Amino acid sequence: MNLLYKSTRNSDKTVTASQAILKGLADDGGLFVPVSVPKLDVTMDELKDMSYQETAYAVMKQFFTDFTEEELKHCINSAYDSKFDTEVIAPLVKVGDTYHLELFHGATIAFKDMALSILPHLMITSARKNQVKNDIVILTATSGDTGKAALAGFADVPGTKIIVFYPKGGVSHVQELQMVTQKGENTSVVAIHGNFDNAQSGVKAIFEDK
């Protein structure tokens, strides 16, 4: 059964997972949420012995039902590969009596690598499924970690381009260096005069100018 997505502001209109990924936000400005929450078809005992990639597939196949097994596994394996400094991807480490899930093993050492590594591959696959032939251009504003993680995730992914806007003097020197030294034929970084709110408002204005 195909799991559909609705807006948090309107339950009448539904879209597929790939359509939601391409749109980002619903037409009414709401967020896309699944019309129902599916149940996993694997047990906790089975999950604990799975690799990160296997776990990702077990979860994602329940939510992205218009993707084939081959498509989903390609996205997952393209995202969670040697860009991470451990094959485990997100190790669960015991320190004393506490367990910690380490989310800093990605390309930029930020937890946002977990999502932004797979997003470009999901978007490209979604575009192909919906007969979108143009390049996907990502415009985003950042005040720190997101910019570098997004640049690293989309760098040299065919069919995509990314432009990151940040406030000059509004990010740390290290964060600025991380962004402006990012390699990739499809990446651009723009410093603006103003603060993060100005950068974010500018990006929103571009999207609203139809």
Language model features: what each stretch is:
Residues 1-210:
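PLP-dependent amino-acid enzyme catalytic core
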